[in-house]
Regions:
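Short leucine-rich amphipathic alpha-helices used at interfaces
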Residues: 1-3, 38-39, 69-70
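N-terminal helix-turn-helix DNA-binding core of bacterial DNA-binding proteins
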Residues: 5-11, 17-57, 83-90
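Beta-hairpin "wing" of winged helix-turn-helix
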Residues: 34, 70-79, 86
């Protein structure tokens, strides 16, 4: 993980709204109802459900989701007329390992290999 990608991830996570959404996406069955289209885990959560749960407008939620996607913390998938989002668990694990190494004063460079 390079400095630029780390900075994008931290910037995306600096918003309480984006952080909350990401935490919900990590446990979609606990936070969202079953969907007519797409599996909550395999396909992701429909942006409509995210919008309803967070209580913001759809354009605002889409802007937040774009930031998370640009930081490679979520992926998106179109099913019919809707966009579904799911977390990039591998990227989140890399970020977590990077933080642990930094906290332990270990080599951060070695944590991304």
């Amino acid at each position: 993980m390079n400095d630029e990608s780390s900075a994008k991830m931290f910037a995306a996570l600096s918003s309480p709204v984006r952080l909350r959404i990401l935490l919900w996406l990590l446990e979609p069955r606990a936070h969202f109802p079953e969907q007519q289209d797409g599996d909550l885990v395999d396909d992701g959560v429909c942006v409509g459900f995210i919008t309803e749960k967070i209580g913001l407008t759809q354009p605002t939620v889409s802007a937040h989701m774009k930031k998370l996607a640009e930081a490679e913390l979520v992926t998106s998938k179109r099913i019919g007329n809707w966009i579904f989002y799911r977390p990039q668990r591998k990227k989140l694990k890399i970020l977590g390992n990077w933080l642990l190494c930094a906290a332990d004063n270990s080599s951060v460079e070695n944590s991304t290999k």
